[in-house]
A protein has these predicted regions:
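Short helix-capping segments at alpha-helix termini
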Residues: 28-32
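Non-catalytic, surface beta->alpha helical segment in thiol-disulfide oxidoreductase systems
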Residues: 62-85
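Thiol-based oxidoreductase modules, predominantly thioredoxin-like and allied folds used
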Residues: 33-44
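A short, hydrophobic beta-strand/beta-hairpin element that forms part of a small beta-sheet core
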Residues: 55-63
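Short Fe-S-cluster ligation motifs
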Residues: 42-56
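Local sequence-structure signature of Cys/Sec-based thiol-disulfide redox active-site neighborhoods
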Residues: 2-26
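Generic recognition of short, well-ordered alpha-helical segments
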Residues: 18-22, 48-49, 69
Length: 85
């Protein structure tokens, strides 16, 4: 199974962003995911896109969710996503 890249767009000091990262990191080996954190603080384009929505979560470049992460929903999304690759 190919490893998926999970990108979390957030800001420094964002507690929801930290929560999402801390929820996924312990699952990364089991779920075969690489976690990529992107801070939007100094990027006007990303700030315009995601400024009020962080954390924003993408899987292999495809939008999954924003504000929160339900681990079971994430696992289901990941499984369906991989079936269509």
């Amino acid at each position: 199974m190919k490893q998926s890249v999970v990108t979390i767009y957030g800001r420094g000091g964002c507690h929801l962003c930290e929560y999402v990262v801390n929820l996924l990191v312990p699952q990364s080996d089991q779920l075969n995911i690489e976690i990529n954190e992107v801070l939007i603080d100094n990027n006007k384009e990303l700030e315009d896109l995601y400024g009020q929505l962080i954390p924003v979560i993408h899987v292999d470049g495809k939008y999954f969710s924003h504000f929160r992460l339900d681990l079971e929903e994430f696992k289901s999304f990941l499984e369906k996503h991989r079936q269509h690759q």
